[in-house]
């Protein structure tokens, strides 16, 4: 059975979803559904909000622009958020868009921008990050949207980190070049017990970490992982590490 019906249109809403409810579509959603997709009253689409699962909703039109979504039946129950918290030095616009979309597709449960010594982007557009997360979830049948944190200075993020949660650091100078072997050395093999309920993944900027930051990682107990013999761009390194984590302890 497919994860979700790829033949049906799918949209995200902020409102609650329940039988007997009625959701007024935003102007943008109404324009997209009625004018771009050419749907009409009585047609059905899939709707989700990140909390109440996925619902098949009937379109109800009133006039040329007003549109309501009426939940008819739940097609899938809500899934829990992913266990990976992705901490990253912010990237410039297009590359950040790409990173967010792919991280959501791969099941990251929380996105946490951290400001480092060599961070390229000075500002982070959280609304744009959320829009990219929603678009990826809509297109890929995902039910749980990641939490998106306010940007935080790296030292504050480390100070607030729960010592019981493993924190993996992508480090091209780490001892073991095979990422899966490195992860098993740090977390144990997948058959050694239940996978971590949560794991942090820390990816740095293009300029790398400063000496002071590396010392702070050691003090915080970060577990270093090398992602093979090649130097990867920031967005590639993070996604490669997510793939390795998911393959060994994730929700595949």
Label for each model-derived stretch:
Residues 1-77, 127:
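N-terminal positively charged helical leader segments and presequences
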Residues 35-66, 155-188:
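N-terminal-biased segments
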Residues 69, 145-149, 224:
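Generic structural signal for residues in well-ordered beta-strands
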Residues 74-172:
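RNA substrate-binding interface of SAM-dependent RNA methyltransferases
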Residues 211-252:
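Structured adenosyl-cofactor binding patch, chiefly the S-adenosyl-L-methionine
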């Amino acid at each position: 059975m497919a994860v979700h019906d790829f033949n049906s249109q799918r949209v995200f809403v902020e409102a609650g979803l329940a039988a007997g409810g009625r959701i007024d579509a935003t102007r943008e959603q109404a324009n997209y559904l009625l004018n771009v997709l050419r749907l009409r009253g009585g047609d059905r689409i899939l709707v989700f909000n990140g909390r109440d699962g996925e619902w098949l909703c009937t379109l109800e039109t009133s006039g040329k622009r007003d549109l309501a979504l009426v939940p008819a039946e739940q097609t899938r129950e809500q899934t829990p958020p992913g266990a990976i918290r992705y901490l990253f030095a912010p990237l410039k616009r297009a590359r950040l868009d790409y990173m967010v979309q792919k991280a959501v597709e791969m099941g990251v449960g929380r996105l946490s921008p951290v400001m480092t010594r060599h961070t390229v982007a000075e500002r982070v557009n959280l609304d744009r990050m959320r829009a990219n997360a929603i678009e990826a979830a809509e297109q890929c049948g995902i039910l749980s949207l990641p939490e998106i944190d306010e940007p935080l200075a790296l030292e504050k993020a480390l100070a607030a980190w729960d010592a019981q949660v493993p924190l993996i650091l992508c480090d091209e100078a780490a001892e073991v070049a095979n990422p899966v072997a490195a992860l098993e050395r740090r977390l144990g093999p997948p058959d050694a017990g239940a996978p971590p309920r949560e794991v942090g993944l820390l990816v740095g900027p293009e300029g790398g970490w400063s000496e002071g930051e590396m010392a702070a990682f050691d003090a915080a107990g970060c577990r270093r992982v090398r992602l093979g013999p090649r130097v990867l761009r920031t967005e590639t390194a993070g996604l490669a590490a997510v793939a390795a984590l998911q393959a060994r302890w994730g929700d595949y």
